[in-house]
């Protein structure tokens, strides 16, 4: 069961992030496959179903991904003005050793280059699919005084340049 179509986009992202973290943790604990492509396909579909007029999604095939460095492109659109902002996104899944072993610097460089030369220009990002077990409270306090649970970081985004500068992220939690 996916997010309700009455949710705002932020609530949908939060719901899918928690679902990603939970399902990924369960799959690793049980030794079952829950692949990066499955997570991507499921989340993109849920977002498109819940917010068809706010988000335009274009998923790249493997040939286009090799050239662009991106798994998908998002356009967040302001309906009345028909203006939007574009993101080129590459996904990486945390493995059972809590690393992003599939990270390739050449792919990150392709993502940065392709997003900058595409017209209209898109912003290059990574979306990291993360898991923790057991779930814990991590991160800074929110404006409401509460800490976010680790499930809130199930889908975490970072600008691609930061990822490249960090030479491939690792998590030691």
Where are these regions (language model features)?
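Gram-negative outer-membrane beta-barrel domains
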Residues: 43, 81-82
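Acidic, metal/cofactor-coordinating or nucleic-acid-engaging core segments within structured domains
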Residues: 98-173
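Extended charged low-complexity segments that act as oligomerization/scaffolding linkers
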Residues: 1, 11-20, 105-109, 114
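Active-site metal-binding core of divalent-cation-utilizing nuclease and nuclease-like domains
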Residues: 58-68, 77-79
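Conserved catalytic cores of phosphodiester-cleaving nucleases, focusing on short active-site segments
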Residues: 72, 85-93
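Alpha-helix termini
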Residues: 49-52, 77-81
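Acidic-basic catalytic patches of nuclease active cores, encompassing PD-(D/E)XK
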Residues: 6-58
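Residue-level signal for short segments within beta-strands and strand-turn junctions
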Residues: 76-78, 93, 130
